[in-house]
């Protein structure tokens, strides 16, 4: 793939054409040290020009769709690849780049940072009127996406657009690339390129009781903010500061996704996509309850009895070391690492603040049946008393399947993964706090 690898679908007099520039031999119209212009002849008397121009430390990428026919042309889909900073294993890691992007209509932008975190940052912004409205996982970015988005099965939120080009008219779009020295300069450049700098507090995932404050800054005037659900989204304009900063207060009463469309400049738009959840206390309690009710194995015939495992939402079933489902890695249901450790430590933290007898009993069941003397060695097991098997499967480690204690730490001696120790120390400490602070579990402290 190369920069300028563009594809599009357009309609002329009821007939649809889908073309990829990679399949058509172009004509080079200009090739100088600071500029190259390339031309493609497309079906139905349509021409497409791409021009790359170097201006100091900046590069402009201009796309010109020229309708030379006698009939209107409707561009329904236009997409491009962006092979910039893709992971390249043929070079050293520090020479690669990390890509970050905000896909947000006319205010979309991309930037690439060195993997080392040091050095210049490459920023890509939109030319006036250019908008990115959709992207696919395989790296296709859409300027128009009328056919690309499956509105029946896809949950994509941004609207799809098309562009009608009249006879002998040009449709111009494009991008700018520039270098910045740091993240603050990224924001400054976005502002300079007529983008929108957004700051939101406390964040874009909120609960109904939160008041959300939003600051928008742009060289172009903010015309209006339009709520997706006007009766359930309160938008209050607080003030305009220093001419180019606009301050708003939002309040949401509808759970789920809530979109606010920002109209700015001359018919430009971008979006503020919020997600509104139930109150935090409700969420904390619901999550702990689900873990205990749905995600713990209770089968004394299994070596993983007591394990908190992963729940397959699509199939509504609990996965296990005997049944990985669509998982690729055994460690995800083996009892260690983040997928397993996160659940008991969460339930224990929750019960320090909001104690529940059934949930505390679930933690005790986990410790007695899965951890003590199994995942974790007891104080009487030698060598390595109290050692924790931070592995895909402690049962196989203990059995000697992968070796003994002198095998370098891959068999019976695999107890070197430090992260698991901090997790289980936290669980023990939380159980102590529960027993000490909550009268309903005074019997636990005595144990």
Could you describe each region identified by the protein language model?
Residues 2-62, 66-70, 147-161, 167, ...:
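Extended, loop-rich substrate-binding clefts of extracytoplasmic carbohydrate-active enzymes
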Residues 39-43, 55, 81-83, 115-204, ...:
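Beta-strand-rich recognition/accessory modules
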Residues 39-108, 266-270, 274-280:
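Acidic (Asp/Glu-rich), glycine- and aromatic
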Residues 69-79, 185-188, 222-227:
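Short, hydrophobic/aromatic beta-strand segments
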Residues 89-92, 188-209, 270-312:
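Low-complexity, Pro/Ser/Thr- and charge-rich linker/hinge segments at domain boundaries
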Residues 206-221:
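Aromatic/hydrophobic beta-strand junction motif of beta-rich domains
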Residues 218-286:
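Extended acidic/polar, glycine-enriched regions
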Residues 287-447:
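Catalytic cores of extracellular degradative/oxidative enzymes
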């Amino acid at each position: 793939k190369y920069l300028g690898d563009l594809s599009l679908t357009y309609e002329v007099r009821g007939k649809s054409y889908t073309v990829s520039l990679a399949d058509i031999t172009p004509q080079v119209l200009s090739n100088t040290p600071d500029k190259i212009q390339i031309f493609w002849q497309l079906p139905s008397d349509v021409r497409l020009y791409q021009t790359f121009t170097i201006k100091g430390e900046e590069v402009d990428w201009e796309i010109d769709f020229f309708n030379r026919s006698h009939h209107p042309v409707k561009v329904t889909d236009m997409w491009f690849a962006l092979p910039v900073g893709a992971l390249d294993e043929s070079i050293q890691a520090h020479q690669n780049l990390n890509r970050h992007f905000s896909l947000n209509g006319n205010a979309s932008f991309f930037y690439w940072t060195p993997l080392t975190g040091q050095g210049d940052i490459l920023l890509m912004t939109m030319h006036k009127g250019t908008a990115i409205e959709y992207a696919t996982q395989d790296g296709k970015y859409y300027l128009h996406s009328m056919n690309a988005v499956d509105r029946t099965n896809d949950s994509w939120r941004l609207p799809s657009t098309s562009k009608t080009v009249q006879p002998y008219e040009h449709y111009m779009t494009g991008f700018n690339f520039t270098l910045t020295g740091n993240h603050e300069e990224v924001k400054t450049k976005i502002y300079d390129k007529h983008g929108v700098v957004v700051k939101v507090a406390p964040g874009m995932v909120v609960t109904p009781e939160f008041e959300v404050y939003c600051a928008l800054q742009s060289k172009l005037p903010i015309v209006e903010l339009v709520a997706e659900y006007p009766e359930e989204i309160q938008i209050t304009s607080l003030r305009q500061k220093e001419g180019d900063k606009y301050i708003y207060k939002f309040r949401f009463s509808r759970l789920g996704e809530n979109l606010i469309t920002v109209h700015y400049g001359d018919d430009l738009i971008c979006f503020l996509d919020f997600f509104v959840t139930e109150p935090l206390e409700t969420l904390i309690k619901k999550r702990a309850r689900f873990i205990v009710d749905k995600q713990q194995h209770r089968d004394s015939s299994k070596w993983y009895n007591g394990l908190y495992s992963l729940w397959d939402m699509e199939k509504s079933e609990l996965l296990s070391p005997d049944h990985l489902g669509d998982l690729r890695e055994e460690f995800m249901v083996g009892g260690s690492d983040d997928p397993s450790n996160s659940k008991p430590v969460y339930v224990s933290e929750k019960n320090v603040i909001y104690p529940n007898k059934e949930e505390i009993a679930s933690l005790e069941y986990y410790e007695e049946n899965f951890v003590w003397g199994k995942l974790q060695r007891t104080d009487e097991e030698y060598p390595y008393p109290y050692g924790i098997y931070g592995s895909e499967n402690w049962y196989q480690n203990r059995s000697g399947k992968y070796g003994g204690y002198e095998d370098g730490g891959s068999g019976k001696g695999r107890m070197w993964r430090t992260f698991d120790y901090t997790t289980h120390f936290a669980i023990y400490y939380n159980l102590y706090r529960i027993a000490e602070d909550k009268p309903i579990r005074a019997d636990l402290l005595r144990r």
